Amino acid sequence: MGEDSDDSAEADSHRLRDLIENSSDLIGAVAGGAIGLVGGPAGSIGGAAAGVAITKTIRRVGVEVYDRLLVARQQERVGTVLAVALDDAQARAADGEKIRDDGFFDSGEGQRSDAEELLEGVLLQAANAYQERKLRHLGAILPSLAVRPDIPPADGHWLARLADRLTWRQFVVLAIFANPPEERLSLRDIDQDVSGGMGPTGGLRQEVEELGTFGLLGVTNSNGETGPVGSTYDSASGIWGVPMVRWRLTLQGRLLVDVARLADISTTDRESVLNDLLA
């Protein structure tokens, strides 16, 4: 990534602070008390707290994308994701997590860095994210990848694209099965066997099936190993043919949960969707 001039960096820092403050209402609604940047120390945006490489990326790409947008609500969504990204980056730095040094933030001749490309993609997705509860999790993607050299940039783009495609309710389902309530799932399976029930119908059923199709939600076999839907006899016709107590996140599903911080989804949101699943 090329060097910013001092004047340019300072101007972008002021613009970034302004656009985040202009998004403060949505930030409060989406992230609540989790975001402490607005009105906070100038160092958060200047790079002293979050790390210079990631802050430069957020500052440069954030201002550029924000200024391209003409619709105020889209600008607020982008400002919200930028605030989340800065806050997460600052928290990770405070926890002693090290920024990757494998070239993720380096630009080449006439080429932007992988970090810049990924952030632009996430921000453009965020601008059109009408399910605004997703914004907190879209904002987590760059700071997560910034400290995960084990995740290649191409995989990072794939994860960001997946996060864009999924609905909020699919986010919640993944969060539930990151730590599944096995006793409740077992009781549900027994009730379904007795009553001959088929589980929920409509959109939720289709959304869960789609998580299996995307390779994010799988099933355990007789050895307790998790595999994709279709890898066991009873999952040949789809995930709903398998007792729910055997549903598990795949490796890809766990990766998305980690990168997008889906484990932070509230207990209230999880309970609401879980009750629908168990119906």
Language-model segments: residues:
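Short amphipathic alpha-helical segments, especially helix-boundary/capping motifs
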Residues: 5-8, 115-117, 147-151
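Membrane-inserting effector segments that mediate pore formation, membrane fusion
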Residues: 7-83
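Eukaryotic partner-binding/assembly regions in large regulatory complexes
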Residues: 57-145
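Long, helix-rich, hydrophobic modules that act as membrane-proximal anchors or helical bundle/coiled-coil regulators
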Residues: 120-279
